[in-house]
């Protein structure tokens, strides 16, 4: 809750700095013109209780109330899914950097048990990006993802630089 509050109130051009330590969290949502800096030894550890994650609808109506807007999905279909550990949705100029770790900790929950069966909603991604621009992930490690690790949809100018993905083969 505190980390999301810091992200939500971060001023334009500001940085949310996460020092070394382990921080249990569910879904975090970034906003435009901000940086999330994970110091070496900082671990954002995903919550193992799926009921702590918001459910995102697969499709939303657009502002003109005629067209639809794809928000999330499963296997290419617009289906309700849990929000990811890190969500970058309809924003621009976002940086996630440092030498810290996003650890979904999925192996210690039930995320990988019968993974093709929907339980409440479809599994989240570690980093979910939708309809965003100028996004950079730099230097971080992402591991033990619930399902897809890095999932960009309609993202322009995405830089993935010097980062690591560590997942078991059966994740």
Each predicted region: which residue ranges?
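Extracellular/periplasmic carbohydrate-active domains that bind, remodel
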Residues: 1-171
């Amino acid at each position: 809750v505190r980390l999301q509050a810091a992200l939500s109130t971060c001023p334009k051009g500001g940085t949310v700095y996460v020092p070394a330590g382990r921080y249990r969290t569910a879904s975090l949502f970034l906003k435009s013109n901000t940086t999330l800096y994970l110091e070496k030894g900082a671990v954002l550890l995903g919550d193992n209780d799926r009921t702590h994650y918001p459910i995102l609808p697969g499709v939303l109506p657009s502002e003109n109330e005629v067209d639809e807007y794809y928000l999330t999905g499963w296997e290419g279909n617009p289906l309700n899914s849990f929000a990811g550990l890190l969500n970058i949705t309809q924003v621009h100029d976002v940086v996630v950097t440092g030498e810290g770790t996003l650890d979904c900790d999925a192996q210690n929950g039930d995320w990988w048990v019968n993974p093709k069966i929907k339980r409440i909603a479809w599994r989240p991604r570690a980093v979910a990006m939708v309809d965003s621009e100028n996004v950079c992930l730099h230097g971080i490690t992402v591991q033990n993802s619930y399902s897809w690790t890095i999932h960009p949809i309609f993202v322009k100018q995405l830089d993935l630089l010097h980062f690591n993905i560590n997942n078991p083969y059966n994740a």
